[in-house]
Amino acid sequence: MTASPSKLAQLRELSVVVADTGDYDAIKRLQPVDCTTNPTLVKKALDLPVYADLLERELAWGRAHGGDDRTTTVDEVADRLTIGVGVKLSALVPGRVSTEVDADLAHDTQATIAKARKFVAMYAERGVPKDKILIKIAATWEGIEAARQLQLEGIDCNLTLIFNRAQALACAEANVFLISPFVGRILDYYVAQGQTPASIDEDPGVVFVRTVYNAFKQRGSSTVVMGASFRSTAQIEALAGCDRLTISPDLLEKLDAEHGELPRKLSPGNANNAQITPIDSDSFASGLAADPMATEKLVSGIDTFAKDLHALRKTIADKLAG
């Protein structure tokens, strides 16, 4: 008797599976289509033996090019390591690698555009074309406006920290390639408020992603919906059929070990090609202001990403000084 396929194998038939990690060996083992990175994952990755040569090479570059402006040197080494990790990962996955623009630029449209262009150029210098990467940007109004311009230049973007319908619709109206609504962090907020859902179908993170997915499909939007920030395999299973799902290695391993039927929960249905109403900065701001959860989680998410980047830079500074 043939063993039934794992839930991970079944999920691959319904959604594009993305690994939320920079762990080279985990990606090699789990074989996702895409992978997503951030400064924390890059910092963790640099502790792995597979990246030892990259780390030493870029630290040597930093020591050779370090002038009086130590901060600039550290920032440049952080960028070079971030791209270096992405280059190695791009050779492993058939699809895209998401690389994050500095979170401390989240409210600066022009600086975000400049950093995105720099990253694309750095990848190109290392033989990775722009159709292998996604530039990850926090979904502030300024970030979305940066993505609007970058998309016109053929630079595909992943707008992250999506917690609110106004954010999602603004991204779709800007023709952003992909958005990442954060399932787990939405749930975290309501659980902290004493509002634990009675069932997975009432999980506010799951409900939000389903709502956005259906709204996009009904409007004929080409923007990809990629569920992110999962706390359990139950949340993932509840979104089977979503365009893409970015999942940590531990949850991918659990899905690979589980069997039993995994039914489709989301389907494109019949899109009616309705237009998405343009959202201006005022309606975007009012949409966020009316949503305490989204306001809190966007601010804290940017702050966490910024702290993670600063931690990466501190690690580099310490190694350069050592």
UniProtKB/Swiss-Prot annotation:
Enzyme Commission numbers on file:
2.2.1.2
What top-level class of enzyme does the UniProt entry assign?
transferase
Role noted for this protein: Transaldolase is important for the balance of metabolites in the pentose-phosphate pathway.
Pathway given in the UniProt record: Carbohydrate degradation; pentose phosphate pathway; D-glyceraldehyde 3-phosphate and beta-D-fructose 6-phosphate from D-ribose 5-phosphate and D-xylulose 5-phosphate (non-oxidative stage): step 2/3
| Any Pfam family the entry gives | TAL_FSA
Coarsely, its chief localization is: cytoplasm
Q: What is the protein name given in its UniProt record?
A: Transaldolase
Active site location: 136 (schiff-base intermediate with substrate)
